């Protein structure tokens, strides 16, 4: 991909960012309160590199010779870290360009997040980076870190420990909080990237790089906005095929989106569309920072793929019941069924009072040796994917010895330690941290993390098509043009357009016996029902004519300037009501919605969503994942609807939506689904 960073996608080039031989710190200072001091000091604490402080006021900084300009440095520079006032950055960046520095990290703030003047400055540095082919990270970021190469090119308090997790974040503050927590729990990182305002490099560049980074096994991402929806899905899919990718997205609520806009100057895509795009790309979406931290624990345990069948091993009944309830209520986890052979083995080594079902309760006086006996048997059980090892402190509890055994048996099967308590368990917890496993303080945290990893905690993508927020700018297509467009894509509208009352008699005769429905056709009336523009259950031609007059009066009263193009006459149809629609997302493009219609769409919002294009397989999944599927399959002897017809309609609507970028919304509502096919009873297309 050729992006605004103009960055060659080669390992050697990326090496200059993540393991540079020569680094310049522009804005280096001996004053500890300033960013330039912290960045330089952090670099000096790491692996030996050639480090060049650049300062217009100093000849020496932290024992190193300082240069007035990066141009005064004779040696080539791989990476420049800029920590000067925002208004000076353009000049400094030009000097980096003249020096042919391949990577520049602008840590300085005061750009688009600060208002119009800052926005102009950011556009200027983006143009400079483009001119000189500089791969620019930032501005307004913490910096760059690599736990594997001992690089801390940031002003974070600590550097990351070596590990196999990459963290890519549009929030520097969240990054430093996660880093501090991770260091306290002995969790390492391969790469640690603060994106800042993304004037050059974006999350997409790092998705592309990390897909082939052998040092990274899992990727955590914090996003406030997406720079390019189509490329996001393509690169995220590629990354997710090779690594486990977990994203937490901020700006989901209306209030949250407003905070995002003020913080980064970017608009957030709709939550439901973002979630659908991630799901289609194979990315796990989580809802909370707590889930983010707990999934990081799972990655440290080496758990990067979902576990399903769990055993709870405990020395306390109460906590294990809580854990069992949480597992039982999970859509993606289950308590493993232990074989009679396994239960017999457990009975042979455990006290008579012990419970050998699941949970396996080895009772309160359990020693480390008893935990060992149980773990030896359970870790050999093929039908068990993982074990929650719970411990509560009693007088005879051997927390340290038990922790040592857990470390030993964790090499045979995934073990999730849950040592509950405080001071009495600290020695054991410290041993678990030291050994690289760590501890979940509550069983719910471990279970939530496993659920999130399986995707079952992921918020389901659901939206209900609504009227546009700016109806004065968006108008429905005229009925004949809409009918023609729908027909072109294999979507036939039910009913007959009648231009005047004179045509009602022949239209009724053509349709046969009633009851009938009559609906106004006007590009000036978006919501027909609200304007009393719909009449239902009309028994004969006389009732139809009366309804025409009543609808005409209502429209004239509600919308005096509205032009009525005619009315659609239909037979009242029987079937299962569904809704199929499209809303064009500004980031990801057409989002297709399917769900139950009628009262269900308003009251239950039972819908599924995908980003176009949608093929037959995706359409089938959309239909099957709504909660009301059984209503469509038929209850108490009812016939099932014709699912193939529904799925074909979804695919055709996806094709239509992609054909014209000016179309902002499409509603097919209701669509009557029956055992023999479908009927599109009403439609609306907004352009």
Task: State what each model feature region is.
Residues 2-687:
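Catalytic-core regions of core metabolic enzymes
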């Amino acid at each position: 991909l050729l992006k605004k960073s103009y960055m060659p996608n080669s390992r050697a080039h990326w090496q200059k960012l993540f393991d540079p031989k020569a680094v310049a710190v522009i804005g280096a200072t001996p004053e500890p309160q300033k960013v330039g001091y912290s960045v330089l000091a952090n670099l000096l604490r790491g692996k030996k590199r050639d480090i060049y402080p650049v300062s217009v006021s100093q000849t020496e900084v932290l024992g190193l010779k300082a240069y007035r300009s990066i141009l005064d440095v004779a040696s080539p520079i791989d990476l420049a870290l800029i920590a000067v006032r925002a208004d000076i950055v353009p000049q400094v960046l030009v000097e980096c360009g003249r020096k042919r520095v391949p990577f520049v990290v602008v840590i300085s703030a005061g750009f688009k997040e600060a208002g119009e003047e800052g926005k102009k400055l950011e556009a200027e540095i983006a143009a400079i980076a483009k001119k000189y082919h500089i791969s620019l990270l930032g501005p307004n970021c913490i910096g760059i870190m690599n736990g594997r190469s001992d690089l801390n090119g940031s002003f974070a308090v600590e550097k990351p420990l070596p590990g196999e997790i990459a963290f890519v974040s549009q929030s520097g503050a969240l990054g430093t909080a996660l880093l501090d927590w991770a260091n306290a729990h002995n969790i390492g990182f391969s790469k640690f990237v603060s994106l800042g305002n993304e004037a050059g490099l974006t999350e997409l560049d790092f998705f592309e790089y990390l897909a082939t980074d052998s040092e990274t096994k899992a990727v955590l991402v914090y996003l406030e906005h997406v720079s390019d929806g189509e490329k996001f899905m393509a690169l995220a899919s590629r990354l997710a095929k090779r690594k486990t990718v977990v994203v937490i997205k901020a700006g989901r609520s209306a209030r949250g989106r407003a905070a995002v806009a003020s913080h980064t100057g970017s608009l957030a895509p709709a939550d439901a569309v973002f979630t659908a795009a991630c799901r289609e790309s194979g990315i796990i979406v989580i809802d909370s920072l707590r889930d983010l931290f707990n999934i990081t624990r799972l990655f440290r345990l080496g758990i990067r793929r979902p576990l399903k069948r769990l055993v709870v091993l405990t020395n306390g009944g109460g906590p294990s019941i809580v854990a069992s309830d949480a597992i039982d209520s999970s859509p993606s986890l289950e308590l493993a069924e232990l074989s009679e052979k396994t239960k017999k083995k457990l009975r042979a080594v455990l006290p008579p009072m012990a419970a050998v079902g699941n949970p396996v309760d080895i009772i309160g006086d359990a020693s480390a040796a008893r935990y060992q006996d149980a773990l030896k048997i359970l870790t050999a059980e093929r039908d068990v994917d993982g074990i929650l090892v719970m411990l509560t402190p009693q007088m005879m509890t051997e927390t340290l010895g038990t922790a040592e055994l857990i470390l030993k048996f964790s090499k045979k099967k995934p073990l999730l330690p849950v040592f509950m308590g405080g001071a009495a368990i600290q020695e054991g917890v410290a041993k678990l941290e030291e050994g690289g496993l760590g501890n979940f303080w509550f069983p719910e945290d471990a279970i939530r993390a496993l659920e999130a990893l399986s995707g079952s905690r992921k918020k389901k993508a659901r939206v209900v098509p609504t009227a546009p927020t700016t109806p004065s700018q968006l108008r429905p297509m005229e009925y004949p043009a809409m009918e023609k467009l729908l027909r072109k894509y294999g979507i036939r509208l039910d009913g007959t357009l009648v231009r005047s009352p004179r045509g009602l008699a022949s239209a009724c005769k053509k349709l046969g016996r009633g009851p009938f429905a009559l609906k106004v056709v006007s590009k000036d009336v978006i919501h027909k029902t609200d304007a009393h523009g719909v009449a239902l259950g009309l028994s004969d031609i006389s009732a139809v004519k009366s309804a025409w007059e009543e609808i005409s009066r209502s429209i004239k009263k509600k919308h005096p300037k509205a032009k009525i193009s005619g009315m659609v006459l239909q037979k009242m149809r029987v079937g299962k009501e569904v809704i199929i629609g499209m809303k064009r997302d500004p980031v990801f493009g057409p989002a297709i919605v399917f769900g139950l219609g009628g009262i269900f769409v308003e009251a239950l919002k039972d819908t599924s969503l995908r980003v176009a294009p949608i093929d037959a397989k995706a359409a089938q999944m959309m239909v099957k994942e709504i909660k009301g599927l059984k209503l469509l399959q038929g209850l108490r002897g009812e016939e099932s609807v014709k699912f193939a017809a529904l799925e074909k309609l979804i695919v055709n609507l996806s094709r239509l939506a992609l054909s014209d970028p000016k179309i902002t919304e499409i509603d097919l509502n209701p669509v009557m689904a029956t055992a023999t096919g479908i009927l599109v009873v009403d439609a609306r297309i907004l352009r």
